[in-house]
Structures are given as C-alpha cells and as structure tokens.
C-alpha cells in the first residue's frame, strides 16, 4: 500500500486491460489468406476432428482460426474473413472464420441459426419443418 507522499508524487497507475484477440488490432473483423487447412484433436475429455485453418492476415500476422459448421470449401489460398472468439477445447485457437463471406461458403441445408453460418433462407416450396420439434 503506497504512502500519501508516494501517491502525490506518482498517482495511481491504471491497469491496462489485455485484449483476447490481439491480431485483430481493435477491428471487428480482418481479411486473410489461408496458408494451411487441417484438422486437429481437442483437449481432454472431448474427442473429435476439429477443422481449423492457419490464416495470414492483411496485417501480416499469422493466426489459427476455427471453421464452424458442418462441411466447408476452404483450401490453401482461400480468402477468408475472421472474427474474434476462441474455441475452448482447442489451445491456441482464438479466432473464428466467418461463414458466407468472401471465399467461404455458407453451411448447406442449415435451418436454424442460419445467420451465424451464412445460410440463405430455404425456398417456400421446400418441405417446411414441422413445428414442435417432433413431439
């Protein structure tokens, strides 16, 4: 605890808050080019093959970004848009790829939470899902 004389001399220092996604440099999203698209396994106790991509951003920083949703069309040299948001069971993955923008296609046949996965509204002629979720 500082003395009053020390506070008069220097005052209280404000703690600088650390950002969870430093590569975005305070931008909401950033564009980048995929340098490698691969699958990786999550931490214990989970088990899966999570799809991730190594992305070189427009500010020359290279990050690992998660590809959400089922199926994707990304390969090396694909141009992607990334946003912040970590994946809890993948160490070092602190960014998400935005589906449905730039070279990334939206998730096919997605009926719910469509806006999060860049899926268009299904045509009215298609069989509408029954209300009540199968009850």
From Swiss-Prot:
Short name of one Pfam family: Ribosom_S12_S23
Organism of provenance: Chlorobium limicola (strain DSM 245 / NBRC 103803 / 6330)
Function: With S4 and S5 plays an important role in translational accuracy. Interacts with and stabilizes bases of the 16S rRNA that are involved in tRNA selection in the A site and with the mRNA backbone. Located at the interface of the 30S and 50S subunits, it traverses the body of the 30S subunit contacting proteins on the other side and probably holding the rRNA structure together. The combined cluster of proteins S8, S12 and S17 appears to hold together the shoulder and platform of the 30S subunit.
InterPro entries reported in the protein's UniProt record: NA-bd_OB-fold (IPR012340), Ribosomal_uS12 (IPR006032), Ribosomal_uS12_bac (IPR005679)
Family named by the database record: Belongs to the universal ribosomal protein uS12 family.
Claim: Ribonucleoprotein is one of the keywords in the record: yes
Protein's UniProt name: Small ribosomal subunit protein uS12
List of residues that carry 3-methylthioaspartic acid: 89
Swiss-Prot/TrEMBL keywords: Methylation, Ribonucleoprotein, Ribosomal protein, RNA-binding, rRNA-binding, tRNA-binding
Spans annotated as Disordered: 101-135
Quaternary assembly: Part of the 30S ribosomal subunit. Contacts proteins S8 and S17. May interact with IF1 in the 30S initiation complex.
Low complexity compositional bias, start-end: 118-135
GO cellular component: small ribosomal subunit
GO MF annotation: an example: structural constituent of ribosome
GO BP terms: translation
